[in-house]
Amino acid sequence: MDDRYPGIFIPRLNKIQNRLPDVPFVSQWQEVPQDLICNAEDRECTDTTKHCQCFHVVKVPLNALVELVLVDVRPTRNADSDPPGVPPPTHIHHPFHLHGYYFNLVAQQQNPRNVTPSDIFNMVETGDIPLNLYRSPSKDTVGIPINGFVVLRFVADNPGPWFFHCHLGNHAVSKLYF
């Protein structure tokens, strides 16, 4: 959701809505304007009065261990303050798919209480969320539980640009990918 447009869903990863370049990145990456490319480290998108949109690229060193924590932030509905016509929150799983790799699903939970994504990131970092690091399932697509999260791990041993996106058609069209 975007605070400037109540009731309108604007999907974002790391507070960035992706914008594809006019040329295919896989084959013509040299032609992508550098000022279009960004990631969460070089573009701070914390101001909700601004719509942060760019070609969201995360550069990962070869053979690095990558850990992704994906959190489904479920919008809540307040009948007293929501403008008329605001639709109720959706109740769907987000199936995320990674091209070029298989990842290990090391944790998957519904949010047992109302905690923020930052709380979940901190709990993963401090070990308060147990990770299944042995015999965890290997996948290329995972469903994020409604109002829940997943923790994924893989080794970046297949160099090149790879697409990571929500597999729901309307979310892909609305740019829920990087």
Predicted feature residues:
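Copper-binding active sites and cupredoxin-like electron-transfer domains
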Residues: 1-178
